[in-house]
Amino acid sequence: MNTQSQTIVVKLGTSVLTGGTLKLDRAHMVELVRQCVHLKKLGHQVIVVTSGAIAAGREHLNYPELPKTMANKQLLAAVGQSCLIQAWQSLFAIYGVNVGQMLLTRADLDDRERYLNARDMLQALLKNGIVPIVNENDAVATNEIKVGDNDNLSALVGILASADKLLLLTDQSGLFTADPRKDPKAELIKEVHTIDETLRKIAGGSGTALGTGGMATKLQAADIARRAGIEVVIAAGSAENVITDVVDSKPQGTKFLPVECALESRKRWILAGPASNGTIVIDDGAVNAVQQKGSSLLSKGISSISGHFVRGGVAKIVNTKGELIARGISRYSSDDLHKILGKHSQDIYAVLGYEYGPVAIHRDDLVLI
């Protein structure tokens, strides 16, 4: 067993916690808890990102079918979250371990100060030997109950905690060359060095009815985490000793190797935190300058703007084919950029009557994707 202290984020999908049924599988949950506690005893820090609130609420209320309306889904989440945290609390208590609940929303990560507060709270729990149990605040977060929820959340939590490993446990044994449920010739991809369009095409859509994340969202989460220097493993939550095996570097599922030059703290926040409310399309010359030369983005290289964002807001940067190039904090609002796009830096003041510097997005505020 690897005894060097590590911080491990374990994301447990609804399919893992329910075993494909309509209620929580507490017998399996206690086995997962046993593995987490074993890691703690070896000096590792463990964070659990849990799905299952809607499933727990449906079980508790004996709800006949999965509701279609947002309000009723959030009703089940509100009831189920208390059941879910009670289940985790009672199971960890068997081993004398305390847990602390953290319910996050996108707003907690969009704002830099709130992001840092969340990071400090997470670190405080870990330093006091408490296992953080993290979930999206489903009852109020309208953007959560759709594809991408806790997979992406677990990557963001990994960044908050400066984690070493992120385990995305699901009902599949990892990422395959095709959907193994449909193609008997599908082969497990054991190790991934680069996430490209080929892999994205292999990844499918949403998974189970009770859950909201499919392999595509896990791939997206893996890409975010590995860019922050975190090793990611997608594996079957039902596999024997899957958590302890991954930490001990034994083969389980699909391993995504982290990027060697991990991002510094502020750029991690740009990558993980704020939602992008607008898109900046840049020409080929600007793409080359940003990607190959590490330059700042100038207004001259901007072809068009879509969406709305304020000065200091985060925008997606794409090439003329619509391919995502980067994310960055804009020094000018979208309204201002509409006026100065294609203009030389020295012309900004003449056009606007003011300026916030010669660049649209400084390279220190730019994260390549």
From Swiss-Prot:
Compartments, as annotated in UniProt: Cytoplasm
GO MF annotation terms: ATP binding; glutamate 5-kinase activity; RNA binding
rRNA processing listed as a keyword: no
Keywords, comma-separated and alphabetical: Amino-acid biosynthesis, ATP-binding, Cytoplasm, Kinase, Nucleotide-binding, Proline biosynthesis, Transferase
One Pfam entry name: AA_kinase
Residues reported in the UniProt entry to bind substrate: S51, D138, N150
PROSITE patterns, alphabetized: GLUTAMATE_5_KINASE (PS00902), PUA (PS50890)
Statement: the UniProt record of this protein carries the keyword ATP-binding: yes
Pathway(s) this gene product operates in, as recorded in its UniProt entry: Amino-acid biosynthesis; L-proline biosynthesis; L-glutamate 5-semialdehyde from L-glutamate: step 1/2
Enzyme class (EC, first level): transferase
The reaction(s) this protein catalyses: L-glutamate + ATP = L-glutamyl 5-phosphate + ADP
GO biological process, one term: L-proline biosynthetic process
Gene3D superfamilies: Acetylglutamate kinase-like, PUA domain
Residues that bind ATP: K11, T170, D171, T212, G213, G214, M215, A216, T217, K218
EC number annotated for this UniProt entry: 2.7.2.11
PANTHER family: GLUTAMATE 5-KINASE, ISOPENTENYL PHOSPHATE KINASE
Task of the protein: Catalyzes the transfer of a phosphate group to glutamate to form L-glutamate 5-phosphate.
Family: Belongs to the glutamate 5-kinase family.
UniProt-recorded name of the protein: Glutamate 5-kinase
Organism: Aliivibrio salmonicida (strain LFI1238) (Vibrio salmonicida (strain LFI1238))
Record lineage: Bacteria, Pseudomonadati, Pseudomonadota, Gammaproteobacteria, Vibrionales
